[in-house]
Every structure is written in structure tokens, then in C-alpha cells.
């Protein structure tokens, strides 16, 4: 139990410890893009990405790794549909309008790699691709299909 001074010191000491921990705790760094810069939203028009907030950020629950900011082409959409991932047909039950030529979308890294290997990858906006895409896709391959972000 201790004296009043001991109890006060214990309380103040604990508070100082917590303040110290807050001061030295590293500032949480937001997600980075494949260029090592802060990740920016891929699309404001469509609700894309794992979080459906327009950004290609991810977490450990995103098994598909929706981290590649792509610009749709009719060629890629046809390939994707043929491969079993129909991105062009609207699905109102999921609030999905369907994608068309020129739409941006956070694509699964493995799907982009599959399309790349088939010679059909969509273009990408490097500034908006989350860095973990590099665990699956070579940066040089992304750069070869990069378009300038607005």
C-alpha cells in the first residue's frame, strides 16, 4: 500500500512512462507505393481496393492482394473474363458497376502477373501501386506498362 508520497510517485511515474513511450514510439508510416513514396488513391470515381476506399492499400486479410492500380483496356477485360474473372459485367448486388476501357481498378497482383505472362496486362499507375506488389511482380515489368498518373 505504501505512503501517500509513494502512491503519488507510482502514479506520476507510470504517467511519465506512458508519455515517454508515446514520445519515442515511431510515427506510423502510411503505406508506400512501388517507388518507395507515400501511396496515393488509385481511383476516386469507383470504390476499388481491398478497403473499397479508392486506394490499393492492403492488409493480411486481403488474400488476393488488390495492390496494382491498373487502367482497364478492352483487351485486358476480355482476357480477364476468359480467365474467369469478369470485371466488365455490372453486379448491382455488390455495388459493382462493371468496368470499361479507361477505368482504374486495384487489381490482384497475381492476376496482373498472369495477364503479363499471357501478353495482356493492363497499364499501371506506379504511384498508386502498393509496394507489396513487388513480392509478386518485378518492378521492371510494371514500369514497362506504366502510364503517368494525373
Predicted regions located by residue number:
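Extended boundary segments
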Residues: 24-75, 146-148
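Short, basic/aromatic beta-hairpin or loop at an interaction surface
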Residues: 71-86
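Glycine- and charge-enriched low-complexity intrinsically disordered segments
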Residues: 131-150
